[in-house]
Amino acid sequence: MSNGTPTHTLSVLVEDKPGVLARVSSLFSRRGFNIQSLAVGATEQKDMSRMTIVVSVEDSPLEQITKQLNKLINVIKIVEQEEDNSVSRELALIKVRADATTRGQIIEAVNLFRAKVVDVSTESLTIEATGTPEKLEALLRVLEPYGIREIAQSGVVSVSRGPRGIGAAK
């Protein structure tokens, strides 16, 4: 939830063509909705891409946006990923200030979150963490007292639980 507004995760299967991302994102911006997270990547189907869009919006406007998305020629299919029926993950790279006295404590915290150290320097550690947005927020809260120098986060990616994929026939 974001400010009491429901958060929705949409998986959108699209043709892998120039301009599709701009057309899809403009549908949200024209209606004044901020996309909280956006991830786009290849799929198991040649010439198709998958967009995972996270947006905070009430159900009724979301239904309108979904109808408009379905009218776009390059949009093949849209699925709302319900929290109970999907697996969602995000990736974060976090650079934390670390010296000889704090390095051990930071590594201990990183291990608790099943994250890993991917770069070490005399003054910092770079950590790779994957998980739900809530897990990553919790890790950031733990690391904050040490001094976070830099964060790079991917968008949320999500797939339905079970054997069927977004491209599966009905």
UniProtKB/Swiss-Prot annotation:
Do the record's keywords include Ubl conjugation? yes
Q: Where is this cross-link: Isoglutamyl lysine isopeptide (Lys-Gln) (interchain with Q-Cter in protein Pup)?
A: K46
Cite the GO molecular-function annotations of the record: acetolactate synthase activity; acetolactate synthase regulator activity
The record's catalysed reaction(s) read: 2 pyruvate + H(+) = (2S)-2-acetolactate + CO2
Residue span, ACT domain: 9-83
Gene coding for it: ilvH
Q: Which family does it belong to?
A: Belongs to the acetolactate synthase small subunit family.
EC id = 2.2.1.6
Recite the UniProt keywords alphabetically.
Answer: Amino-acid biosynthesis, Branched-chain amino acid biosynthesis, Isopeptide bond, Transferase, Ubl conjugation
Hey, which pathway is this one from? Amino-acid biosynthesis; L-isoleucine biosynthesis; L-isoleucine from 2-oxobutanoate: step 1/4; Amino-acid biosynthesis; L-valine biosynthesis; L-valine from pyruvate: step 1/4
Q: Can you quote a single GO CC term?
A: cytosol
Subunit record text: Dimer of large and small chains.
* KW Ribonucleoprotein (keyword) present: no
Q: Which InterPro entries match?
A: Acetalactate_synth_ssu, Acetolactate_synth/TF_NikR_C, Acetolactate_synth_ssu_C, ACT-like_dom_sf, ACT_dom, AHAS_ACT, AHAS_small-like_ACT
| Gene Ontology BP term (one) | isoleucine biosynthetic process
Q: Which organism is it from?
A: Mycolicibacterium smegmatis (strain ATCC 700084 / mc(2)155)
- Pfam families found in the cross-reference section: ACT_AHAS_ss (PF22629), ALS_ss_C (PF10369)
This chain belongs to which protein, by name? Acetolactate synthase small subunit
